[in-house]
């Protein structure tokens, strides 16, 4: 019996050290990796499917959170086993166990305080307990209004740009930097398309509000006008449909006979995107898994979150031409990924225009790729009857790229509509990523 208690005691102290260590290192890892996210995003991704997550993120957690926790627990267990074999070391074992446990508990308390303060965890739970009339006062259910289709149905190409901000332009154009990292996108917004900037001559963009500050939430916001709350993230991992009660752009266009497709360079299951788009408009899902299963990329090929944007744009051209060859109008939606935090993915097309600033180089490369893609679209016969929407999904979560921006500067996602009908409105609009559907 004494031996059993001895074994259980060693197991208990090991498990305690592992759990406390994991909590501490997980919070430290989160605060270092995700410096610019909100607690609702953390909760959302805790419940969303892990399938499709960038393996770099998983390995980072393993090395920086799980491994040190296991080492502490293993060291403490080993120490207990070795010292408890010696009769004169029993008191020392107890002192060590109490001391280590005390250090871990105090460290957990300090880390938890810093974590809660950084992510306003208390405010998050206070908000959960309060009701809000925001949706009731501002959301218009598409089912309650008369939507009249135009005489000639127009094609829609909706390009979600990962973490793309109007912020990345130069100060003279309405951005926050001395350099313009997105000259082509800036030109589209100020000289060719509509960014709802009125007569300001400056870039205008969309605010990222609660429930739309991460990719899945942002895509739901822009296509449904609703926030993707954490309980929806939970449902996305267990249900065949995502937000079943919502009416989205996909639902509306499906009723009008549109062929629809979603193209992403990652696993569309991640964040519930596959469920959402297939359940709202019966989109064809062309993602990383589809590309591999159908020979677009070699078996086992994987960079970044799946495959890089250089391939994404090539696949987009093929898919759009296929859609355009059919008699029905089409809605082609795509999402880039190279500009995802941390620091983005440097592909073969990227130039070292900004030495020592990888993220700036990746953003500049994305700007160039989008430009070449849009210019290709303009040369196609279907373009005259096609509207292009280019929007950042949310502001970047990169840990340091925007650190030196003036606190008074209001960061917004990039947004422009090309070849719009009717023409650009004269008035300036102050809008969020919930508004494009309107």
Task: Describe each model-derived feature in a short phrase.
Residues 1-126:
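Transmembrane and membrane-interface helices of multi-pass
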Residues 2-10, 60, 81, 89-94, ...:
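Polar/charged alpha-helical tracts
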Residues 117-118, 127, 132, 276:
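Short linear sequence motifs
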Residues 141-438:
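Solvent-exposed soluble domains appended to multi-pass membrane proteins
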């Amino acid at each position: 019996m004494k031996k059993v208690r001895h074994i259980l005691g060693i197991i208990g102290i090991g498990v305690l050290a592992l759990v406390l260590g994991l909590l501490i290192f997980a919070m430290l890892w989160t605060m270092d990796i995700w410096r610019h996210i909100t607690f609702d995003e953390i909760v959302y991704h805790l419940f969303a499917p892990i399938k499709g997550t960038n393996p770099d993120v998983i390995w980072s957690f393993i090395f920086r959170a799980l491994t040190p926790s296991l080492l502490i627990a293993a060291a403490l267990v080993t120490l207990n086993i070795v010292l408890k074999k010696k009769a004169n070391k029993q008191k020392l074992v107890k002192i060590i166990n109490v001391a280590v446990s005390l250090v871990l508990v105090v460290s957990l308390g300090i880390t938890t305080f810093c974590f809660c303060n950084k992510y306003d965890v208390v405010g998050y739970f206070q908000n959960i307990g309060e009701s809000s009339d925001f949706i009731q006062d501002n959301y218009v259910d598409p089912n309650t209004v008369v939507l009249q289709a135009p005489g000639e149905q127009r094609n829609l190409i909706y390009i979600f740009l990962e973490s793309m901000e109007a912020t990345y332009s130069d100060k003279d154009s309405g951005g926050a930097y001395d350099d313009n990292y997105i000259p082509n996108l800036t030109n589209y917004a100020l000289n060719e398309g509509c960014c709802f900037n009125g007569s300001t001559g400056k870039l205008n963009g969309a605010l990222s509000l609660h429930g739309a500050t991460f990719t899945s939430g942002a895509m739901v916001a822009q296509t449904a006008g609703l926030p993707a709350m954490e309980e929806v993230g939970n449902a996305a991992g267990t249900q065949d449909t995502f937000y079943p009660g919502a009416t989205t752009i996909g639902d509306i266009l499906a009723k009008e006979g549109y062929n629809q497709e979603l193209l992403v360079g990652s696993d569309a299951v991640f964040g519930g995107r596959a469920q959402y788009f297939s359940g709202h408009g019966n989109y064809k899902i062309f993602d990383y898994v589809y590309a591999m299963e159908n020979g677009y990329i070699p078996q086992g090929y994987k960079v970044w979150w799946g495959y890089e944007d250089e391939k994404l744009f090539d696949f987009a051209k093929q898919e759009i031409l296929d859609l355009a060859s059919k008699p029905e109008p089409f809605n082609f939606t795509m999402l880039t990924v190279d500009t995802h935090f941390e620091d983005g993915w440097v592909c073969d097309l990227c130039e070292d225009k900004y030495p020592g600033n990888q993220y700036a180089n990746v953003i500049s490369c994305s700007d160039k790729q989008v430009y070449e893609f849009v210019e290709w679209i303009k040369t196609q016969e279907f373009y005259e009857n096609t509207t292009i929407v280019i929007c950042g999904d949310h502001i970047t979560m990169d840990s340091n790229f925007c650190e030196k921006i003036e606190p008074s500067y209001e960061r917004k996602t990039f947004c422009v509509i090309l070849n719009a009908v009717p023409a650009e409105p004269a008035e300036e609009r102050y809008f969020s990523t919930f508004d494009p559907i309107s």
